[in-house]
Amino acid sequence: MKAKDSVEIISTKAVFVGDPKAPVTLMQFGDYESEACAKVNEVVEKLLKEFQGKLKFNFRHFPLTRIHQHAMKAAEASLGAAQEGKFWEMHRMLFAHRRRLGAISLREYAKDCGVVNKKFLEDLVNSTYGWQVKSDLLEGLDKGVRDVPAFFINDELFTGKPTFENLRKGIEAALRQHKRKKKPASKARA
């Protein structure tokens, strides 16, 4: 009997969109069946355009399984897509189709996003990425997340309503703080 090869699984902690060296990180804990998360996803897209080069975004899973029966599998599907570098394509697809997130639909969305893993559906059925979703959920709980969408700007909980204007103000404040921290270091070299 041959031992299975171990495969390194890419977690959501390692999946960002935006400049990897950006001074501000916007992290969201969300649920693919949540209407509020779907709406705020459009806000995040606008923020990424406005703060191009200054902002990177990380989406973390916080499925509200008591009210959203497909949220867990949708999160797992996004991680399955992430293994082939298709997380963001799947992320957008899941929000666009948030009312149809059954396993067969998830497999079709994955194909539409360019995922070629023939075991994609099998991985969903076997919860191959379930532990990773649970890891995000537990981290969210540790950080005080109780509902979605929940945002963190440079690891600080954002407490306002997640509108474009409010998040923009939070990001601008983080950029100002970053500049203040940078100035003393450059003066010390002079």
Could you describe each region identified by the protein language model?
Residues 29-30, 36-46, 108-190:
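C-terminal cap of thioredoxin/glutaredoxin-like
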Residues 19-21, 29, 69, 146:
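A generic fold-level signal
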Residues 7-24:
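A short beta-strand-turn-helix
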Residues 1-6:
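N-proximal helix/coil linker or "cap" segments that precede and/or mark the start of modular domains
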Residues 27-28, 32-112, 116, 172, ...:
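Structural alpha/beta surface segment adjacent to cysteine/selenocysteine redox centers
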